[in-house]
Design a protein with these regions (language model features):
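Residue-level marker for buried hydrophobic side chains located in beta-strands
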Residues: 211, 307-308
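Short amphipathic alpha-helix segments
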Residues: 282-295
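Short helix/loop segment immediately N-terminal to the Walker
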Residues: 294-305
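Polymerase palm active-site segment centered on the conserved acidic dipeptide of motif C
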Residues: 237-244, 304-306, 316-347
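Conserved pre-catalytic core of RNA-dependent polymerases
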Residues: 1-13, 17-22, 52, 64-284
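Short beta-strand->loop micro-motif that forms the acidic, two-metal-ion catalytic signature
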Residues: 311-315
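Extended, charge-enriched "interface" segments that sit outside catalytic cores
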Residues: 8-32, 38-57
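Short, contiguous pre-domain boundary segments
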Residues: 57-65
Length: 347
């Protein structure tokens, strides 16, 4: 029984609760839900390290200066975010919270200075040591309903403010860069759109087959060079950030049962938990989705592809279902992703 006399939650119920918070982007609540429970068994650290595969860092590229106009717009976005911070969100590795940063809004000069710092960090206009210290995150191991782990990075408040500033300022550019087949970023009610569109397609053509794909550890495995190249082509306004944030090794920390933090290094992918990561991942995936769509249309003109981050669904005539499956798997492998065969489904 629970301390209050009620029934204790099972591990599966706890995992479902945390997973629901994650799906609603309530990372702070998910983290709080985890840390109040008993720590995971030993061996979690090794499992987490294995989920951050090594890879080559992007080659250095020159990035032009940010115009005064764009800088002013970014500062305005940062000021807004400093004034409406989320309450009781979990802190990053250095213990700083949004409430600490929110206090600067009580003084106009401090407010402006803090916004300038957020923008400088977003554009990489600070020392390498400062970047490294504030790009790192606390890693939490959230257990999925199937018993496997999901690594969640709870970054510094400065990083989260900078990421949200970039998302706010580049909202339309990000939406266009993600492409027409991505429904998780820049789309209002994107999940509902996918569901209703697929329902309509299958009602109109009941002989079609729906194939669902899920990529294993997708955020942590996409090559950073691929992301950088995609951003340069599709959303060049984000290049200063991507060059500064992804061109060096990121060091995260995991606190186990003791009080000592163990480092976890990342040289591939983007951090699941950073507000900018879904956009960067989706931009990196956009060209692959376009190629999948063209490949499917070559098999059957009525074919369609839909993506909700790394969850990909295709609707094709049953006669070309096997060929469509092969085309999707090969294309995703080409961008460094591995389809989880155990989660592949057809109906």
């Amino acid at each position: 029984l629970a301390p209050g006399g009620g029934r204790s939650e099972t591990l599966k119920e706890q995992a479902r609760s945390v997973d629901a918070f994650i799906r609603d982007s309530l990372i702070g609540k998910a983290v709080a839900r985890v840390v109040r429970n008993t720590p995971f068994a030993t061996g979690v650290y090794d499992a987490l390290v294995a989920m951050f595969p090594t890879g080559d860092l992007p080659a250095a590229q020159g990035v032009g200066p940010t115009s005064p106009e764009v800088r002013g717009q970014l500062v305005a976005c940062a000021r807004k975010l400093l004034a409406r911070w989320p309450s009781r969100a979990a802190p990053g590795p250095n213990g700083s919270r949004f409430e600490h940063w929110g206090a600067v809004t009580q003084d106009e000069e401090s407010w402006e200075d803090a916004a300038q710092v957020v923008v400088m960090f977003a554009l990489g206009e600070c020392s390498r040591d400062f970047l490294e210290a504030n790009l790192g995150a606390r890693i939490f191991a959230l257990r999925k309903p199937n018993g496997k782990l999901r690594p969640i990075a709870c970054g510094s408040v400065l990083r989260r403010l900078a990421a949200r500033t970039l998302c706010m300022h580049n909202k339309e550019d990000i939406r266009q860069a993600c492409g027409e087949y991505q429904f998780a970023v820049g789309r209002h009610a994107g999940c509902e759109l996918v569901h209703k569109t697929i329902s309509a397609l299958t009602c109109a053509s009941p002989q079609d087959v729906v194939l669902k794909f899920d990529c294993s550890n997708a955020f942590n495995t996409m090559p950073r060079q691929l992301i950088l190249d995609a951003v340069q082509q599709r959303a060049p306004g984000l290049m200063p950030t991507v060059m500064a944030w992804l061109s060096q090794r990121t060091t995260h920390f995991y606190w186990g049962e003791g009080r000592t933090a163990s480092p976890i290094h990342a040289t591939r992918g983007v951090d699941q938990g950073c507000p900018l990561s879904p956009a960067l991942f989706a931009i990196g995936l956009a060209a692959a989705l376009e190629y999948i769509q063209s490949s499917l249309v070559a098999l059957a003109p009525s074919s369609r592809v839909f993506s909700y981050l790394d969850d990909i669904i295709v609707v094709v005539p049953a006669a070309v279902g096997e060929s469509a499956l092969d085309a999707v798997v090969r294309t995703l492998e080409g961008v460094g992703l591995t389809v989880n065969a155990g989660k592949t489904a057809a109906w």
